[in-house]
From Swiss-Prot:
It comes from Staphylococcus epidermidis (strain ATCC 35984 / DSM 28319 / BCRC 17069 / CCUG 31568 / BM 3577 / RP62A). The gene is nusB. The keyword Cell wall biogenesis/degradation does not apply. Belongs to the NusB family. Keywords: RNA-binding, Transcription, Transcription antitermination, Transcription regulation. GO terms for molecular function: RNA binding. One of its GO terms (biological process) is DNA-templated transcription termination. Gene3D superfamilies: NusB-like. One of its GO terms (cellular component) is cytosol. This is Transcription antitermination protein NusB. Involved in transcription antitermination. Required for transcription of ribosomal RNA (rRNA) genes. Binds specifically to the boxA antiterminator sequence of the ribosomal RNA (rrn) operons.
Length: 129
Protein backbone atom coordinates (compact mmCIF):
# COMPACT_ATOMS: atom_id res chain seq x y z
CA UNK A 1 0.00 0.00 0.00
CA UNK A 2 1.00 3.60 -0.44
CA UNK A 3 2.37 6.22 1.90
CA UNK A 4 -1.05 7.84 1.65
CA UNK A 5 -2.62 4.76 3.24
CA UNK A 6 0.12 4.70 5.86
CA UNK A 7 -0.60 8.34 6.72
CA UNK A 8 -4.29 7.51 7.18
CA UNK A 9 -3.38 4.75 9.62
CA UNK A 10 -0.88 7.00 11.41
CA UNK A 11 -3.61 9.64 11.76
CA UNK A 12 -6.07 7.09 13.12
CA UNK A 13 -3.48 5.78 15.56
CA UNK A 14 -2.66 9.29 16.82
CA UNK A 15 -6.36 10.10 17.09
CA UNK A 16 -6.97 6.94 19.09
CA UNK A 17 -4.06 7.71 21.41
CA UNK A 18 -5.30 11.28 21.94
CA UNK A 19 -8.99 10.65 22.58
CA UNK A 20 -8.70 7.62 24.79
CA UNK A 21 -7.47 7.86 28.32
CA UNK A 22 -5.63 4.60 28.20
CA UNK A 23 -2.29 3.05 28.96
CA UNK A 24 -2.10 1.85 25.36
CA UNK A 25 1.41 2.27 23.98
CA UNK A 26 2.20 3.41 20.47
CA UNK A 27 3.44 -0.06 19.60
CA UNK A 28 0.22 -1.66 20.92
CA UNK A 29 -1.92 0.82 18.98
CA UNK A 30 -0.03 0.02 15.78
CA UNK A 31 -0.30 -3.72 16.42
CA UNK A 32 -4.10 -3.39 16.28
CA UNK A 33 -3.97 -2.30 12.64
CA UNK A 34 -1.40 -4.88 11.50
CA UNK A 35 -3.97 -7.68 11.29
CA UNK A 36 -6.19 -5.78 8.85
CA UNK A 37 -3.46 -3.96 6.93
CA UNK A 38 -0.42 -6.23 6.73
CA UNK A 39 0.79 -4.57 3.53
CA UNK A 40 1.34 -1.11 5.05
CA UNK A 41 4.75 0.46 5.67
CA UNK A 42 4.75 0.03 9.45
CA UNK A 43 8.25 1.48 9.82
CA UNK A 44 6.93 4.74 8.33
CA UNK A 45 3.79 4.65 10.50
CA UNK A 46 5.85 4.04 13.64
CA UNK A 47 8.32 6.81 12.66
CA UNK A 48 5.49 9.28 12.06
CA UNK A 49 3.46 8.43 15.17
CA UNK A 50 6.45 8.39 17.53
CA UNK A 51 7.85 11.53 15.93
CA UNK A 52 4.62 13.43 16.47
CA UNK A 53 4.28 12.19 20.05
CA UNK A 54 7.94 12.80 20.95
CA UNK A 55 8.10 16.27 19.36
CA UNK A 56 4.58 17.48 20.14
CA UNK A 57 5.67 20.57 22.11
CA UNK A 58 8.10 21.71 19.40
CA UNK A 59 5.55 20.99 16.67
CA UNK A 60 2.89 23.02 18.48
CA UNK A 61 5.35 25.91 18.91
CA UNK A 62 6.13 25.74 15.19
CA UNK A 63 2.43 25.75 14.25
CA UNK A 64 1.19 28.41 16.73
CA UNK A 65 2.53 31.54 14.96
CA UNK A 66 0.53 30.57 11.86
CA UNK A 67 -2.83 30.20 13.65
CA UNK A 68 -4.36 33.60 13.13
CA UNK A 69 -6.85 34.25 15.96
CA UNK A 70 -6.73 30.59 17.05
CA UNK A 71 -4.96 28.65 19.75
CA UNK A 72 -3.73 25.12 19.20
CA UNK A 73 -6.05 23.87 21.95
CA UNK A 74 -9.15 25.29 20.24
CA UNK A 75 -8.57 23.40 17.00
CA UNK A 76 -10.52 20.26 16.29
CA UNK A 77 -8.55 17.21 17.37
CA UNK A 78 -8.46 16.00 13.78
CA UNK A 79 -7.04 19.30 12.49
CA UNK A 80 -4.49 19.49 15.30
CA UNK A 81 -3.25 15.95 14.64
CA UNK A 82 -3.04 16.50 10.88
CA UNK A 83 -1.11 19.75 11.36
CA UNK A 84 1.31 18.03 13.74
CA UNK A 85 1.81 15.09 11.39
CA UNK A 86 2.46 17.27 8.37
CA UNK A 87 4.71 19.67 10.26
CA UNK A 88 6.78 16.78 11.57
CA UNK A 89 7.10 15.32 8.09
CA UNK A 90 8.02 18.70 6.57
CA UNK A 91 10.73 19.23 9.18
CA UNK A 92 12.11 15.70 9.44
CA UNK A 93 11.84 14.00 6.05
CA UNK A 94 12.95 14.46 2.48
CA UNK A 95 9.39 14.20 1.17
CA UNK A 96 8.68 17.35 -0.87
CA UNK A 97 6.68 19.90 1.11
CA UNK A 98 4.11 20.12 -1.68
CA UNK A 99 3.40 16.38 -1.34
CA UNK A 100 3.12 16.57 2.46
CA UNK A 101 0.75 19.55 2.29
CA UNK A 102 -1.40 17.86 -0.37
CA UNK A 103 -1.63 14.67 1.71
CA UNK A 104 -2.59 16.72 4.77
CA UNK A 105 -5.30 18.50 2.79
CA UNK A 106 -6.68 15.14 1.64
CA UNK A 107 -6.66 13.80 5.22
CA UNK A 108 -8.50 16.92 6.35
CA UNK A 109 -11.14 16.49 3.64
CA UNK A 110 -11.62 12.90 4.81
CA UNK A 111 -11.57 13.36 8.59
CA UNK A 112 -12.52 16.97 9.39
CA UNK A 113 -15.24 19.53 8.74
CA UNK A 114 -16.04 20.66 5.21
CA UNK A 115 -13.88 23.74 4.68
CA UNK A 116 -11.14 23.03 7.20
CA UNK A 117 -8.81 21.80 4.46
CA UNK A 118 -8.38 25.45 3.40
CA UNK A 119 -7.25 26.36 6.91
CA UNK A 120 -4.84 23.41 7.10
CA UNK A 121 -3.44 24.29 3.67
CA UNK A 122 -2.91 27.91 4.71
CA UNK A 123 -1.14 27.03 7.95
CA UNK A 124 1.12 24.41 6.38
CA UNK A 125 2.01 26.67 3.45
CA UNK A 126 3.67 28.97 5.98
CA UNK A 127 5.71 26.27 7.74
CA UNK A 128 9.34 26.46 6.63
CA UNK A 129 11.06 23.24 5.69
Amino acid sequence: MSRKDARVQAFQTLFQLEIKETDLTIQEAIEFIKDDHSDLDFDFIYWLVTGVKDHQIVLDETIKPHLKDWSIDRLLKSDRIILRMATFEILHSDTPKKVVVNEAVELTKQFSDDDHYKFVNGVLSNIND
